[in-house]
C-alpha cells in the first residue's frame, strides 16, 4: 500500500467573506505541512478573501455564491492529489491534526472524520451544539451505526471515493459526505478534535440551515437504504 506524505495532500475549503480568518487558516496549513500541501479555495466572496488566499499561495477557484455544498463539492473534486482534507475557513478547526488524519489514511481508512462533540465543543454556540448532537443521533438511528458528528467540516478522504460517489446535497453536504461512504461499507474513523471559537460572523441561519440539514440526513439515509 502506498504511504502518503504531505506531498500527496490537498486541503480544500469553500470560502465566503472570511477575510478575518483565512490568513490564519492558510498560515497554519503551511506551517504544519511545511508548505507541501496543495490548498484549494472555492470562493464566492465580495471582500478580500480571494486576494489574501492567492497571496498566501492557495489555488482560488472563483464561483458565484450558490450555497455551502456547491462550493465544497467543487473544492473536493478539484485536486489531483490522492488525499483530500476538507476544512472550514473560519479558523475553528485544528490544522495540527493533519498529520494524524494522514496517518489514519495510511492505516487503511477511507474517511477520517473530525469529531467536535466528544471533546465538548464548549466554544460552539449552545443552539448549534444541541443541533449537531441531534443530527448525529438522527443519522445514527437511520444508518444503524453510531456516528458522533455528522456536520463537522474537517475530514480526510481518499480522492477516488470522492469521485466514485454522486453528491446531491447543498446545505446538508457535510452530513452526506459521511453518511454515503459509511452506508456503502467504506472504512470510517472518527477522531475527537478540539473546536475553536470562530473568527468573524457565521453565514448560516441556525433554523433554516438546521431544517435543511435534517431533511438531507433523512433523504440520504433513505436513499442509501434503498440501494442495499
From Swiss-Prot:
Q: Could you say what a knockout of this gene produces?
A: Cells do not generate the small monosaccharide-charged dolichol phosphate species.
Query: Which keywords label this protein?
Result: Glycosyltransferase, Transferase
> Which cysteines are disulphide-bonded?
none
Annotated CDD domains: DPM_DPG-synthase_like
GO MF, one term, reads: glycosyltransferase activity
UniProt keyword annotation of Transferase present: yes
What Gene3D superfamilies does the annotation carry? Spore Coat Polysaccharide Biosynthesis Protein SpsA, Chain A
Which PANTHER family does this UniProt record tie to the protein? RFBJ PROTEIN (PTHR48090:SF7), UNDECAPRENYL-PHOSPHATE 4-DEOXY-4-FORMAMIDO-L-ARABINOSE TRANSFERASE-RELATED (PTHR48090)
Question: What protein is this chain from?
Answer: Dolichyl-phosphate hexose transferase HVO_1613
Amino acid at each position: 500500500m502506498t504511504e502518503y506524505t504531505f506531498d500527496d495532500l490537498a486541503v480544500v475549503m469553500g470560502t465566503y467573506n472570511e477575510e478575518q480568518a483565512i490568513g490564519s487558516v492558510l498560515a497554519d496549513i503551511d506551517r504544519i505541512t511545511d508548505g507541501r500541501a496543495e490548498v484549494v479555495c472555492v470562493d464566492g466572496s465580495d471582500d478580500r478573501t480571494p486576494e489574501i488566499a492567492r497571496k498566501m499561495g492557495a489555488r482560488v477557484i472563483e464561483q458565484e455564491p450558490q450555497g455551502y455544498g456547491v462550493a465544497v463539492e467543487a473544492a473536493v473534486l478539484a485536486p489531483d492529489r490522492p488525499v483530500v482534507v476538507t476544512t472550514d475557513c473560519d479558523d475553528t478547526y485544528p490544522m495540527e491534526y493533519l498529520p494524524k488524519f494522514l496517518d489514519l489514511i495510511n492505516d487503511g481508512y477511507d474517511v477520517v472524520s473530525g469529531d467536535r462533540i466528544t471533546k465538548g465543543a464548549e466554544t460552539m454556540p449552545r443552539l448549534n451544539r444541541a443541533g449537531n448532537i441531534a443530527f448525529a443521533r438522527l443519522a445514527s438511528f437511520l444508518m444503524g451505526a453510531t456516528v458522533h458528528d455528522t456536520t463537522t467540516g474537517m475530514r480526510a478522504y481518499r480522492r477516488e471515493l470522492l469521485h466514485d460517489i454522486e453528491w446531491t446535497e447543498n446545505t446538508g453536504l457535510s452530513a452526506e459526505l459521511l453518511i454515503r461512504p459509511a452506508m456503502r461499507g467504506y472504512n470510517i474513523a472518527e477522531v475527537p478534535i478540539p473546536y475553536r471559537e470562530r473568527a468573524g460572523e457565521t453565514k448560516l441561519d441556525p433554523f433554516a440551515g438546521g431544517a435543511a440539514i435534517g431533511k438531507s440526513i433523512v433523504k440520504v439515509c433513505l436513499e442509501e437504504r434503498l440501494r442495499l
